[in-house]
Amino acid sequence: FKASNKSTMASKVLILAHGRSGSSYLGQIFNNHPEVFYMYEPLITLQVTTVHDSKLYEQSAKSLLDDIFNCQFMQQTEFLAFMSHMPLNRFSSHVLTTPYCKSTRRAKDNRTFFQCEDLDPLITSLSCTLHKHVVVKVLTHRLVPFLEEDYLTTLLNSNGNLKIIHLMRDPRAVIASLDRVGWVFNRSVVKSAWTNVSLFSAYVQKFCTQMIQSLSFALSAEAKFHERYKILRYEDLIKTPMTVSQELFDFFGIRMTAEVKDYVTRSSRTNNRRNTHAYSTMRSNVSSLIDSWRKQLSIEAVQTVESNCRPVLDILRYTPVYSQNLP
């Protein structure tokens, strides 16, 4: 990464990634910065109300991203109404909870509960403007209808201090993670891929085609906007989270803080079993996170993913399973 020379300026950050690529963890690194207004998966609200491949979806998504980056929520009442009742999205962002939520502790089991008011357009706009930096995390499939070079050029030109980080992960690990949370298929399909060859292969072929297209787009964007668009491997982030976090903050022109360092340290060292669920942002066992797919996927499943996603493996330097060298 090349450090920004404008560390005192306000920054806008867009995190792009495939689902199950570790983007929630990356987002939480920014979310723990006291000067960051962080928004987790805002476009998911549009998928509830709008046909994904329609012109209306494209227009609404572009407008929503522009309004978020410019702290203008007065015209986004429907969006805020949906976000008010989406716990995962809301509680992934400090700025959407702290001004609105009160916690109470139940005496009999010492559990904490939150009571939150609905998000208010004016308060949300003011909260955003009071934070120096705006960070938004979006999964690439929510941008697929219009994620192209022309839109990227327009987005960057209209937001002079916007930079983009494109997070990529070993496709074998992504498939294993998708299986773990049950997003696509039953566990038996992956664990016994040889008995469900057509179903599993069809999905993997589609997945790898999308991932290859996404990587091709990212490589082109990084070459054209090399000071504003960067590709990051998830594995590099979790191997040396403090070092990579510092490099990222330098790239975006955001100062490192004690709060971020504390979060990175805690998330890397925790042994709390409550943080082992599929949506946890704790990263206590690095080797397990990188290589758990080796135990979860059958050899047939691994070979299917590798044959279809080979360009991704080669370009991002992931070693095929037949090698003894770990990725």
Region spans (language model):
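PAPS-dependent sulfotransferase catalytic core
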Residues: 1-118
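Amphipathic alpha-helical recognition patches that constitute DNA-binding helices
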Residues: 14, 25, 163, 240, ...
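C-terminal accessory extensions appended to soluble enzyme cores
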Residues: 289-327
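Short, well-ordered beta-strand elements within core beta-sheets of diverse protein domains
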Residues: 14-16, 232-237, 293-295
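PAPS-dependent sulfotransferase catalytic domain
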Residues: 93-261, 269-282
